[in-house]
């Protein structure tokens, strides 16, 4: 499990740095502990794996003042765990569900244990996110989404992808644009 912690940290640092996410922004984590363990999503949920990954992600985001939103599975309509103060300050709709291994998943259970005052919210519009195990985080990332290829494409048996976002380009051929801080062009 030490290797899981080390690899998770490397991936998170890579994605956070390249996404150009700012303090106060939201970052979504989608996680299948089953996929990390080499099983099909939802078939071998592991609280231990969820705790390791969420603890590392929280640590790296807290260092940067970025807020974590942990996505649950389809059985909780992909609701997300955030800190209550984040839900209130961003006027997010709080919903009533307590995650378990088979409704919400191991990452949400870990977030409930590791956060100070966790609540579930129906949806967010995050600036970036990390998807470990093909959990489909795109519905919670703001437009325009930019795929980021992480420094490692697998974590255990799980496929790893990431998304950043940028403002829409409007105005057409006559318009000038600010530099794309994600792609540096």
Swiss-Prot record:
Q: Which cysteines are joined by disulfide bonds?
A: none
Superkingdom to which the source organism belongs: Bacteria
Pfam families, per database record? DUF436 (PF04260)
Q: Per the similarity annotation, which family is this?
A: Belongs to the UPF0340 family.
What is the designated name of this protein? Answer: UPF0340 protein SPy_1898/M5005_Spy1614
